[in-house]
Every structure is written in C-alpha cells, then in structure tokens.
C-alpha cells in the first residue's frame, strides 16, 4: 500500500469511527477510543473507577485513535463533548501527545506487559491452577513453580533482547515494518525447564531489512537500566506467558516423566482469549486509576 492509499484508508477508517462516536454521544454515553481490542483489559477498570455508561470505538491503530481525536477537535458541534482515548506507549517518542490530558498512554510498552509480573502469575497459579500457597501440602510446589517461572522469564528476556533492540532501531528510523507474521516460535523455544533462541541469526527473522544500517549501541543505551518486563514488546512477553502456562499444564497431566509436578494433577485451564479471561489478574497502574478518576466529576 503506497502513501496515497494509506492516507485514503486512514481517512475512511476515521469516518467510520466518527459515525460510531456520534452514535455513542447521541445515546448519552461516554465515548472511549482504543487502538484495537484493548477493551478486554480496560472494561473492568473503566467500570470500577469511572462509569459503566460508556461506548467504545475500536480505531484499528494508534495513529487512527489520534486521527479521530483530531477530527473531533476540529468539529464545532462535538469538540466540547467529553471523550477519552487510550494508546500504547510502544517504542514511540510520544512527546507530542504527553500533554494531551484526554489521552492515556500506558506506562509500559503495551497493555500486554501488565500480564506477566510475578504477582499476576501467582494469582493465575492459585486461582486457575488451584495450587494454594496457604495450603501446607501445596506451598512447596507453589514456590517451586514460581521460581521456575522467574528463571524461564529471565532466560526469555535474554533470548528476546536482540530482537527488541532491532525493533526499537527500526522504529527509531521510521521504517514501516510489520511483525505480525513473526511467531513467538520463530524467536524462542519455550520448554518447562529452559528457554532458548530459535534462530542462529537475527537477519533470518527480520528478513525484509538490512540490519547493517543500524547502530546497536543506540538500542543498548535506550534499554540500559530498563525492566524488560515493562519495556520489551508486550505481545511477545504475553505469548511467553501463554506458552509457559501450556507447558505447565502438559507437565501436570503426564503419567510419568514430569519435571515440575511431583504427581499427576488434573488442571482445568483454557488457552482461549487469555487477554480477556485473565484481565482480572493483570496489573492496574496507579496512573490509570488516577486518569480514570479524574474524569468522574465531569460526567
């Protein structure tokens, strides 16, 4: 798609989103705009800290959220209507939107980063896997699995580091590259007792661009001192969690040859739509609570 086609597509998308916006306003609900299916994470938080009386717009991308905002701001009939917007931080500069008080930017790369902390994993282990840390018979197993999770996560971050470095540099140099076709299995092999790289050269993963054009030291400087749990690509981090949970379930169900579980256990666990079903366990940043609460008096 060339630049003209892209602009035409974005314009059409904004037009559709604007019609949805008008419909929400007409029904006296609060319009809320998202990049995509982020409602799966945000819904409970919006209902808890702001209102249940809202309608949402899936704008299909960060730039389209901001384009819709601009369109609303230019419209004399709607510019004073309350509407709030949610976008991911990504590897973007974001300096042009930090001062927009009606736009919430995640404090991490994306909402998916809010699902992978040790604290979230502990809740999943307890509530979904039924391994109770307060039960004397299960507390040792709980601690063992948590320790293994931390070890695998550390290995995963080490393996995924190079990929994140280059994705950051590609973004910095404003190359329009899509990573949707890159599966987690293209990057890492996730086992219950180890995480290793799937590739021998990063150029085999990022095939469409000459990586020799980039100065890796710039990425090293950017990521220095940052927590990969928060600053690495959220989708990759989230897929790591998904895969490891599957590996744990498989280990628990084995008749013999188990590596983590001392005896066979039946664990009722679904891999369907974890972003939505595990939203209740995900972190809720204080800045999100503050953002939502600040609009309560305006309704």
Q: Predicted segments — roles?
A:
Residues 1-299:
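Acidic, divalent-metal-binding catalytic cores of TOPRIM
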């Amino acid at each position: 798609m060339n630049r003209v086609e892209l602009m035409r597509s974005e314009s059409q998308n904004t037009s559709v989103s604007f019609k949805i916006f008008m419909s929400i306003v007409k029904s006296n609900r609060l319009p809320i705009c998202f990049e995509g299916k982020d409602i799966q994470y945000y819904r409970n938080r919006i209902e808890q800290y702001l209102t249940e009386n809202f309608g949402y717009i899936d704008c299909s991308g960060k730039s389209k959220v901001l384009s819709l905002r601009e369109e609303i701001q230019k419209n004399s009939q709607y510019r004073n209507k309350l509407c709030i917007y949610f976008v991911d931080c990504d590897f973007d500069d974001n300096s042009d939107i930090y001062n927009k008080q009606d736009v919430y930017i995640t404090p991490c790369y994306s909402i998916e980063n809010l699902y992978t902390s040790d604290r979230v994993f502990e809740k999943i282990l307890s509530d979904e896997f039924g391994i109770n840390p307060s039960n004397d018979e299960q507390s040792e197993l709980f601690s063992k699995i948590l320790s293994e999770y931390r070890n695998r996560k550390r290995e995963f971050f080490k393996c995924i580091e190079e990929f994140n470095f280059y994705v950051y540099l590609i973004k910095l140099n404003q190359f329009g590259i899509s990573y949707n076709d890159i599966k987690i299995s293209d990057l890492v092999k996730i086992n219950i007792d180890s995480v290793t790289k799937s590739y021998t050269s990063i150029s085999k993963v990022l095939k469409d661009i000459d990586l020799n054009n980039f100065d890796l030291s710039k990425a090293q400087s950017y990521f220095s001192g940052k927590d990969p749990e928060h600053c690495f690509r959220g989708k990759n981090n989230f897929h790591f969690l998904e895969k490891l949970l599957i590996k744990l379930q498989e280990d628990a169900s084995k008749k013999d040859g188990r590596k983590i579980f001392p005896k066979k256990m039946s664990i009722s666990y679904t891999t369907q739509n974890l972003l939505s079903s595990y939203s209740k366990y995900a972190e809720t940043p204080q800045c999100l609570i503050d953002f939502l609460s600040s609009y309560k008096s305006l309704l």
